[in-house]
Amino acid sequence: MTHPDIYPQISDDESPLPDYWQASEGHTYCLVTDGDEVLGLWAFIKKNAVVWEIHTCILPKARGRKAYEALKLLPAWAWANLKGARRIVTEVPDYNRPALVFALKAGMDKYGVNPKSYLKDGELHDVILLGISRGEQCH
């Protein structure tokens, strides 16, 4: 998550790049690979008994075809590995169009907007809440 090509895209103005990153207890991580090649990481945070939040960190070299191939595997992996999961949600700042398109292609529906709730480059942005429920599939 601290990769120099990823961290600037997922951090707000008040989150400087840490010297190191330590996995948090209670989180579930899924390394996205193509053979031995690391493409990125999915981080899942349990929000309550049935909802998990996903954070997607795909390296620039993997964006496009490889990322979408991995995306097709995500729902089945999540339902099999995230205990009690009935819904997966994510929050995407409105300026991050590629992340929004990626979430929508994952089959996520737009649930709503949290207005002016993310500070990036000195500007406030809306945050879009999206999610997918068990039984729904990638588009």
Give, region by region, the residue ranges found by the protein language model.
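Conserved beta-strand in the GNAT
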Residues: 36-46, 52-53
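Conserved acetyl-CoA binding element of GNAT-fold acetyltransferases
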Residues: 49-61, 91
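Conserved catalytic-core motifs of GNAT/GCN5-like acyltransferases
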Residues: 91, 109-125
